[in-house]
Amino acid sequence: MYLCTILGKNLLTSIIFITFAKNLNAMNRIFVFLTATILCAGMVVGCSPKSNKPRRAGTVIRDTIQGTPCCVYLPQNYEARVAKNQEVFPVLYLQHGMYGIEDDWTTQGRLVEIMDSLLHLGEVKEMVVIMPDNCPHRPTSDEERANAMSGEWESHFPEFMAESEAKYNISKDPSLRAIAGLSMGGFHTMHISHFLHGEFAYIGLFSPAIRPTSSHLVYDNWENEVRTLMATEPLYWIGIGKEDFLYDYVAEYRRWLEENHLEYTYYESAGGHTWDNWQDYICRFLKKLFR
């Protein structure tokens, strides 16, 4: 879960503790309040990065790339650094799930807070994070839901990536490129990565849908394409909750990977198809990038 969730839990516990103390006399209530306050202060300190470095704060801008609405996380002083010495940054393409929009990762996913906290701790590299609306037509029916995973977005991605590289100082080196997504975005990530095998050294599938139902060219011989992708030895990271409704599909895919002796990294959490888990997964995935 996101780094400081424990703080909220302990604050809530302390508030409940104080509420139960309402029947105590005045002196005891003061003692209980001071004890709870010290407890909470300790949790704040424990949750804060143990670092004397100045905190680095990225910024998020809205953009349109190849007609696709996007949110883009930029490292601190991005424009000045590019203008001064043409600094080039690693890039992560991060995709939302069905019914989501381009700002899901910044609003519900807490991407900015997670990135800034991990940067302050020195646990991640600075990078640009491009968060596209990978489902620009909001599905409202079963047919439209099927169209959201029809191959259209995956086949469009090379042009989207090319324009992203033209607009931002991001690396074209596959070793400095990552792609990830949750649920439908995990499905898109999986199939973009084999469609463009060799273009991404880091691939993250968070609670992903797996098997395509469309006959689009992107999905032709996808199992063979995954084998070809794995020959390039990417970090292939899969995360899923034990109660996730996609758990069995992911388990089946993992068995297939193992039967074919294809290496991957697997993380299994408690819980289901939730933002608590996806915050946890992105935090773990970010720490592995561009090492």
Question: Whereabouts are the PLM-identified features?
Answer:
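Short intrinsically disordered, low-complexity coil segments enriched in acidic
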Residues: M1-L7, C70-P75
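Bacterial Sec-dependent N-terminal signal peptides
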Residues: Y2, I6-L7, I15-N52
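Non-catalytic cap/lid and distal C-terminal segments of serine-dependent acyl enzymes
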Residues: S48-R291
